[in-house]
């Protein structure tokens, strides 16, 4: 068996995103970014997960906002055409419990959300007050 042929058959394009360091400028609404506060539709409802943290405490916690990717900004790099060509992809994860997703009880500890509407209609929204500061990620622009 020629492993190179096998790997070539399953090889897919990857899009590598890098973030700006020490960028204090405010980013326009609808721009791709890591952390900070997400730009979401007005009817967006924050995601929560009930799980046990490392200290053994079980409670409902808001998921941390990890990133938003403006699909129009990255479509030129999507050589395989797998991503939507417009809209916004959001990534959320519950950082207090840090579930891997292997256990069925982990369901809901991570979310990918897709908004297929007009990104100019998005609203910058604060993370929930119940999200502890240590789980709020600093904003970094994508370069």
Where are the language model's segments positioned?
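Structured catalytic cores of large enzymes
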Residues: 130-131
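Aromatic- and glycine-enriched beta-alpha-beta binding-site module
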Residues: 63-127
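Conserved small/polar residues in nucleotide/adenosyl-binding loops
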Residues: 142-143
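An N-terminus-focused feature that recognizes amino-terminal "leader" regions
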Residues: 1-88
């Amino acid at each position: 068996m020629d492993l190179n042929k096998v790997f070539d058959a399953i090889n897919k394009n990857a899009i590598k995103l890098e973030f700006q360091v020490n960028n204090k400028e405010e980013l326009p609404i609808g721009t791709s970014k890591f952390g900070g506060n997400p730009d979401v539709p007005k009817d967006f409802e924050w995601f929560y997960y009930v799980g046990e943290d490392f200290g053994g405490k079980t409670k409902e916690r808001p998921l941390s906002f990890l990133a938003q990717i403006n699909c129009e900004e990255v479509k030129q790099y999507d050589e395989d055409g797998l991503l939507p060509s417009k809209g916004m992809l959001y990534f959320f994860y519950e950082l207090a419990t840090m579930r891997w997703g292997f256990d069925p009880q982990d369901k809901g500890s991570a979310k990918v959300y897709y908004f297929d509407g007009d990104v100019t209609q998005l609203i910058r929204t604060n993370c929930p007050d119940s999200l502890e500061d240590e789980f709020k990620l600093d904003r970094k622009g994508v370069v």
